Structures are given as C-alpha cells and as structure tokens.
C-alpha cells in the first residue's frame, strides 16, 4: 500500500485519536496532543460524512469537556484548525475554545 505524505498524516492522526478514545474509555484524562487528535478526527470524519463547516465548528466544541482532559489543557487550546476535504473542496475549519 502506497500512501502520500498527506494520507500518512491523516492515518497517524486517526490512530492517535483512536488511542486517545481508548484511554478516555478507561477513565484517563487526555493530554494536549490527545485532545487535539480527538477534535481534529471529529472534524475530518464529519467532513467526510458531508457535514458543513458551520456544523463542525459548533460540534467541535462539544467533543470534549473539562472533565475529559488534564488540568491546564483547556487553557492551552485556544483553537484547533484542521484542513478538511468536503464534497465541494478543501476548507480550513477553525474551532475556537474547543474545550468548554
């Protein structure tokens, strides 16, 4: 299987998000990179499912709460930006204050 660098990056992000979800399911709080991976994966999969940029910007704020992440992580994450592929092209999705 041959993957482009872009596809390798997406695959790595997807795996990091899956690992973070398993840790969260075990009751562990997520660190900064894990939180970004989960939110970014949510956006990428939502775009693949045909959701709009506005929907993903709103739902991206509901993926994780303060109880899901380690202390200090919400303050470190002012925004998460992901370049996602939509049916009508690639767009930058920005989620401001992703951990409420």
UniProtKB/Swiss-Prot annotation:
It catalyses: urea + 2 H2O + H(+) = hydrogencarbonate + 2 NH4(+). Pathway: Nitrogen metabolism; urea degradation; CO(2) and NH(3) from urea (urease route): step 1/1. Keywords: Cytoplasm, Hydrolase. InterPro entries: Urease_gamma, Urease_gamma/gamma-beta_su, Urease_gamma_sf, Urease_subunit. Its main location: cytoplasm. Coiled coil: none annotated. One of its GO terms (cellular component) is cytoplasm. Disulfide bonds: none annotated. It is an enzyme of class 3 (hydrolase). Optimum pH is 7.2. It is found in: Cytoplasm. GO terms for biological process: urea catabolic process. Its EC number is 3.5.1.5. GO terms for molecular function: nickel cation binding; urease activity. PANTHER family: UREASE. NCBIfam families: PRK13241.1, urease_gam. Heterotrimer of UreA (gamma), UreB (beta) and UreC (alpha) subunits. Three heterotrimers associate to form the active enzyme. Belongs to the urease gamma subunit family. This is Urease subunit gamma. It comes from Mycobacterium tuberculosis (strain ATCC 25618 / H37Rv). The lineage of its organism: Bacteria, Bacillati, Actinomycetota, Actinomycetes, Mycobacteriales. The gene is ureA.
